[in-house]
């Protein structure tokens, strides 16, 4: 009997040894080839993902990249992230290369969790779906459309502050910023303005957003499982809205130009076919994610920096009050007003330089190519990082200093300031985000000054930057 169990133990040990050997061999085989970039690959499956993520959790996502740039004396290095062989491109030259070679040498890549949350797309077709989406969006984000949104944004902002800020001594900024940007997205994308209807989406939407880019393990209790459940709930609600909009369009109760939902329902492809309800629901869901999370992070950090830098706040206040005093009672903001907010936008840009809502993004090499003398194999994942230029002294002298004058005149050098990405995949909602941020700034400084309640509150990045406790502040209302 003892010999039998000893034999089983030996077989088990041998099997594990062979399995580990094959795993290491397979892992390392992805990183073989002539003249690859310098770097290390870490453990099988894990690679350097834990260190990559942990620097963000500690509030310093740039450390992962700057440590390796210094170690290897190279602006491109190899690593292994999210179970994939990867090269990190750091610096303006790397940004320019990736942004300029979209759909030539590289194309977009998303973690598998994204495609599993959006089951109407496979990993291959999701890229085609993204292209279709970008053809639809210009109609919604063209200048004449954006001009119409400003008054709506101002109206929603006034209601938001009346409901959630007024008559309060203290507030927690981050959840309120998310509420504001989500309300705007619901109104402008789907014409949903009723706070109760918006609130029905709000909680499941935040569950979805927080679990979208996680380890795709669909087991009860995991963030990914909760994200799947939340996405199914939201889709069900969206399909009900879509069905009703179809009826309203047929009866003349809604118009094609009403919002992006109407536009999607009436748009056709090259063959004259309309999108089905599931496609539209997924596209609206993707727009809600893209049109809400990044702006809410930018707004939160605007509040943070204006609390820490009273002289910056005062200059923003002065500019905004000059605009406010030029308005008739009850008159909403318009396009001309927003164009006058030059200093305020410079402040917002400096905030996004120091705390970029979009930390970076992945591409995939669709062919072998050479960059900076190093070979990049087909199939490798490529990561560009906003922080690699935003916090580089070569791109921004004294990068730790808050200095809005960096954005005066011609502003930063090309490919150094990239909070919205760049090239063909630059965020199509960049101007939309600018408007909602400036409208928020106008309304908040008109009403309040504020102090941080936690002076040393930790910042975490997961995957966007956010104050660990949501940025609680004490409000000091201004007299009307």
Curated annotation (Swiss-Prot):
- Might you give the EC number(s) for this enzyme? 1.14.14.126
- Protein name per its UniProtKB record: Beta-amyrin 28-monooxygenase
Kindly list the biological process annotations in GO that this record carries. Answer: saponin biosynthetic process
Q: Which organism is it from?
A: Vitis vinifera
Keywords, in A-Z order: Heme, Iron, Membrane, Metal-binding, Monooxygenase, Oxidoreductase, Transmembrane, Transmembrane helix
Q: Where is this protein primarily located?
A: membrane
Gene name tied to this protein: CYP716A15
Cofactor(s) listed: heme
Q: Name one Pfam family in it.
A: p450
């Amino acid at each position: 009997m003892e010999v039998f169990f000893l034999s089983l133990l030996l077989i088990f040990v041998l099997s594990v040894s062979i399995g580990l050997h094959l795993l290491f061999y397979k892992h390392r085989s992805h990183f073989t080839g002539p003249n690859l970039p310098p770097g290390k690959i870490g453990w099988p499956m894990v690679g350097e993902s834990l260190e990559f993520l942990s620097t963000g959790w500690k509030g310093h996502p740039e450390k992962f990249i700057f440590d390796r740039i210094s170690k290897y004396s190279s602006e491109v290095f190899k690593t292994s992230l999210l179970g994939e062989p990867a090269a990190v491109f750091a610096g303006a030259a790397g940004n320019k290369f990736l942004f300029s070679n979209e759909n030539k040498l590289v194309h977009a890549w998303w973690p598998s969790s994204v495609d599993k949350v959006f089951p109407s797309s496979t990993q291959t077709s999701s890229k085609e779906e993204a292209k279709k989406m970008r053809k639809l969006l210009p109609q919604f984000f063209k200048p004449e459309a954006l001009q119409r949104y400003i008054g709506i944004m101002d109206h929603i902002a006034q209601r938001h502050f009346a409901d959630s800020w007024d008559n309060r001594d203290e507030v927690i900024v981050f959840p309120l910023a998310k509420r504001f940007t989500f309300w705007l997205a619901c109104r402008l994308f789907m014409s949903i303005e009723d706070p109760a209807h918006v609130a029905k989406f709000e909680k499941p939407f935040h569950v979805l957003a927080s679990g979208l880019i996680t380890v795709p393990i669909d087991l009860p209790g995991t963030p990914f499982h909760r994200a799947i459940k939340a996405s199914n709930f939201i889709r069900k609600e969206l399909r009900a809205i879509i069905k009703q909009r179809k009826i309203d369009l047929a009866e003349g109760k809604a118009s094609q130009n009403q919002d992006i939902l109407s536009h999607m329902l009436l748009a056709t492809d090259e063959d004259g076919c309309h999108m089905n309800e599931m496609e539209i629901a997924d596209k609206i869901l993707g727009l809600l994610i893209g049109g809400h999370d990044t702006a809410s992070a930018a707004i939160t950090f605007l509040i943070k920096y204006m609390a820490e830098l009273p002289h910056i706040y005062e200059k923003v206040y002065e500019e905004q009050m000059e605009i406010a005093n030029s308005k008739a009672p009850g008159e909403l903001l318009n396009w001309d007003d927003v164009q006058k907010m030059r200093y305020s936008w410079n402040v917002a840009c400096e905030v996004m330089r120091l705390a970029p809502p979009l930390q970076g993004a992945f591409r995939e090499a669709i062919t072998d190519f050479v960059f900076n003398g190093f070979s990049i194999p087909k199939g490798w994942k490529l990561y560009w990082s906003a922080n690699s230029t935003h916090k580089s002294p070569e791109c921004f002298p004294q990068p730790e200093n808050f200095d809005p004058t960096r954005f005066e005149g011609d502003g930063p050098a090309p490919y150094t300031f990239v909070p919205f990405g760049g090239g063909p995949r630059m965020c199509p909602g960049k101007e939309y985000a600018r408007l909602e941020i400036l409208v928020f700034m106008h309304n908040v400084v008109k009403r309040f000054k504020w102090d941080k309640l936690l002076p040393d509150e930790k910042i975490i990045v997961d995957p966007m930057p956010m104050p660990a406790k949501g940025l609680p502040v004490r409000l000091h209302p201004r007299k009307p």
